Structures are given as structure tokens and as C-alpha cells.
Curated annotation (Swiss-Prot):
Its main location: cytoplasm. One of its GO terms (molecular function) is homoserine O-succinyltransferase activity. GO terms for biological process: L-methionine biosynthetic process from homoserine via O-succinyl-L-homoserine and cystathionine. It is found in: Cytoplasm. Gene3D superfamilies: 3.40.50.880. Its EC number is 2.3.1.46. It comes from Serratia proteamaculans (strain 568). This is Homoserine O-succinyltransferase. Belongs to the MetA family. GO terms for cellular component: cytoplasm. The active site is at residues 142, 235, 237. The record marks 111 as: Important for acyl-CoA specificity. It holds the Pfam family HTS.
Length: 309
């Protein structure tokens, strides 16, 4: 699906170089099509890199998606130019009276930070509560999953002693579920987190359907029965070199990180890794857009009643 973004957004030229169909707003306005409105709450430090990753996965379908980027942290960014944030991001107050077909809440490097110490925790709570009445389906990724489980289900923060980092094999538990339609019985996906998501805890404290898991990673993909909530605890959006960049960053900082599992050839950080999860990431996002967003959202968002019959 061609994604509609501002003409000047850096992702436009970046993704077009990959032959990804990106439609600038100026052209999209000439087509009489009701685009899906998708809001992305980008909590990652390197926002431009994260934009490229998610927009790539959202682009592979025949309908238009109108992308809106949201920020909730008013502090000065160390990794993204202020001009970029001011030009391409909106504040919550700008969109709080609008409705959206989809919302994506990204991960954040906050695995060792208590919720009460997260600078924008009240804003996270506000957005998640707001989405109940203003968004058809919300997709939470990595740390955002942990935050949402706490806010929506009261599940306390669970933290691993050692960071989970690498590319892991997962089992599809419900192959005929809409979100896993077309999945192989086993598939690979990257993880980079301290957060822990034991399958038994998800089953005990929620009514969410667990769709994919791994012995090493715990629950990977789960969703609400009404399709309004979807959770993915890994990073299917990551580029081939994202884990390598994180490993080098932590190593340079003297944190003595573990080498990401099943990632570098021969587990040698001097060798260039290859992505083994791209097809899974594209299929996951295509299924979410089709079955959780497009097929249940109203044509007129002013008449939103995002529930299944």
C-alpha cells in the first residue's frame, strides 16, 4: 500500500531507493481514495532510522496509508534534529480529538527503568487510554508491550538478568488465526530487550490469545479477541545491521554485552550479519493492516465503533 507522507520526509528518498512505493502528500491528494489513517508513536532515540523501518513494513499493500508521526517527550533529543521533529511530528494535543484506523507504539530503550521513573509515563498512560475510543487497532512493539500490559492488565514489570539479544526461532501456535495467516510453522525474529514475557503469565492474567512463542523468548505475538490490541515482543522491523549497531554501542560504552545469538556469522562480530526475518516482518504487518485495521474500521472515522460483530 503506498504510504502517504510529507514530501520532505527523509524516508521518502530512502525507501524509494529500495523500490518501496511512497506517495508524497501532493500526489495523494489527487486520488479520490479514503486512506487508512495510521498514527505512529515513535519512542526510539534514532527516530529517522525507526521511521524508515516501520514505513518499509507498512508500504506493501494496494491501499493508501496516511502516516502521522507522534511525539510525547518534550525534552531535547540527542539523536534526532529538532528541525526534523518540529517539521514532521505532532504533539498529542494536536490529534487528541481525531480518530485513527491504526496506532503503532514503538519500543524504547527503557528496559532497566522503572515505570515510575520514565519521564513520559503519564503521557504513555494517556495515549493508551485515549486509543480505546479513538483507534480501531493498536500494535505495541517490544517495550511498549510491557507498558501496555501494565496499564491495561496490571501486570508488573518483569526484567531479565541478562539482556535478550539475537535472532530466535519461534513456533506458530495458531496457524489459522488471522494475524498469523501465511506464517510458517517456525520462523525467525530478532529481539533486543531486558523485558520478560513469560507465556504462563500472559495466559494467567489476561484473556489475550497467544499466537506465537519461543522457549528462549517467551510469548512473542499475542492479541485481543476483538482484534483491537496486538502485541509483538520482538523487533520484526529491524534492519540487518540494527542489532550490530546496538552491540557495538554497548561494547564501546564498556557494558560488556553478550554477542547477539544466531546473528553474526560464526558468532563473530567482525563479520557482517544478514537479515533472516524480513519476510516474516512484512507478512505480520500486512496481516495486521488487513485483518485488524482495514476489515473492521469504519469508512467514516467520525462514526467509529471499532468492535466486531
Amino acid at each position: 500500500m503506498p504510504i502517504r507522507v510529507p514530501d520532505e520526509l527523509p524516508a521518502v528518498s530512502f525507501l524509494r531507493n529500495e523500490n518501496v512505493f511512497v506517495m508524497a502528500s501532493s500526489r495523494a491528494k489527487t486520488q479520490e481514495i479514503r486512506p487508512l489513517k495510521v498514527l505512529i508513536l515513535n519512542l526510539m532515540p534514532k527516530k529517522i532510522e525507526t521511521e524508515n523501518q516501520f514505513l518499509r513494513l507498512l508500504s506493501n499493500s494496494p491501499l493508501q496509508i496516511d502516516i502521522q508521526l507522534l511525539r510525547i517527550d518534550s525534552r531535547e533529543s540527542k539523536n534526532t534534529p529538532a528541525e526534523h521533529l518540529n517539521n514532521f511530528y505532532c504533539d498529542f494535543e494536536d490529534i487528541q480529538d481525531e480518530n485513527f484506523d491504526g496506532l503503532i507504539v514503538t519500543g524504547a530503550p527503557l528496559g532497566l527503568v522503572d515505570f515510575c521513573d520514565v519521564a513520559y509515563w503519564p503521557q504513555i498512560e494517556r495515549v493508551i487510554d485515549w486509543a480505546k475510543n479513538h483507534v480501531t487497532s493498536t500494535l505495541f512493539v517490544c517495550w511498549a508491550v510491557q507498558a501496555a500490559l501494565n496499564i491495561l492488565y496490571g501486570i508488573p514489570k518483569m526484567t531479565r538478568e541478562v539482556k535478550l539479544s539475537g535472532v530466535y526461532q519461534h513456533q506458530t501456535l495458531q496457524q489459522h488465526a488471522l494475524l498469523t495467516r501465511g506464517f510458517d510453522e517456525t520462523f525467525l525474529a530478532p529481539h533486543s530487550r531486558y523485558a520478560d514475557f513469560p507465556t504462563e503469565i500472559i495466559r494467567q492474567y489476561t484473556d489475550l490469545d497467544i499466537l506465537a512463542e519461543s522457549e528462549q523468548t517467551g510469548a512473542y505475538l499475542f492479541a485481543s479477541k476483538d482484534k483491537r490490541l496486538a502485541f509483538v515482543t520482538g523487533h520484526p522491523e529491524y534492519d540487518a545491521l540494527t542489532l550490530a549497531g546496538e552491540y557495538c554501542r554497548d561494547n564501546d560504552a564498556g557494558l560488556n554485552p553478550v554477542v547477539p545469538l544466531n546473528y553474526f556469522p560464526d558468532d563473530n562480530p567482525e563479520l557482517t550479519p544478514k537479515a533472516s526475518w524480513r519476510s516474516h516482518g512484512h507478512l505480520l504487518f500486512a496481516n495486521w493492516l488487513n485483518y485488524y485495521v482495514y476489515q473492521i474500521t469504519p469508512y467514516d472515522l467520525r462514526h467509529m465503533n471499532p468492535t466486531l460483530e
